[in-house]
């Protein structure tokens, strides 16, 4: 009887293995609960590329598979640009201005199509000189607190942007606060991470008990030509609803007062690799010690798709696809560490899980500027 049971169990395992192989061939992946779901791809309806700027789309960042997409075969199809191993790359030029269909396809090892997504690649002219002078107010978190973003925007606009805000980043004014989430901007949250300290952040109106754009503009006298809204990293969760709805609430409040004010909503970026996530610390205390790269990528992917769906009918709102156009595999600063405590062999490990190096902020600026040009 024991031998029969063993043979039966081996046969069952073989059938399960065959079933899993079929599911893999169809692009079906197993989640943590042991259930099966289809591969999800996301490309916005349009990708803007300003003349003189290079924009790249990264395979693992447009898919719910994350880095697991490396187990599949992928292809970009377009009349322009470069179909590369891990990305699609396109440099805008005056000669290439126009619209181009761009298709991304995933295949299994048998050559069967698993999933596909498409967008329109729009190569647009650089802003004319008279349009490079405009005022911009950035509402954000620590990802908007790096001078490299503003320096790159200044380079692209010949130093003509007027930055507005009650706080400063280098020589640029902003409303960026380290550690802040959209939820903080909806409440009477204080800000004490850096000088000057604030008892209550300036968008909060005590009378309405929430974020109030009209109150803010009347109090500060700032009336920008455009708003950049770059939030999402703080507050990321498996369920994007709460974080996403808080961002949506800010958009809706601004447009209730200024319905034609352009808002550039920047999708937050993917984190560093697992070494960066696992080793990021403050004086030896792990900051992301319990987090896993695949799970964090899922949170970013689903927040991006939630916002796109929820705000798809919002006028004068322009999504900036930094999440899929930022090279999260290479943009984080690294340091050399031994591969183990007793080895002379060294390896590169990211020094931060969330905040990229200068190249990352410049890539985000290129993406924002291209959308503005569009």
Describe the predicted segments one by one:
Residues 1-22, 26:
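Gram-positive cell-envelope targeting signals
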Residues 21, 25-130:
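Beta-strand-enriched, solvent-exposed domains that form extended recognition/catalytic surfaces
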Residues 123-145, 164-165, 330-333:
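Low-complexity, Pro/Ser/Thr- and charge-rich linker/hinge segments at domain boundaries
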Residues 132-135, 158-162, 222-228, 257-264, ...:
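Loop/turn elements at helix/coil->beta-strand transitions in domains of secreted/extracellular proteins
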Residues 137, 143-239:
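Conserved SGNH/GDSL esterase-like catalytic core that processes O-acyl groups on lipids
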Residues 174-211, 276-294, 320, 326-351:
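Surface-exposed intrinsically disordered loops and tails
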Residues 261, 272-325, 354, 358-365:
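Substrate-gating cap/lid alpha-helix
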Residues 339-374:
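Histidine-centered active-site loop/cap adjacent to the catalytic His
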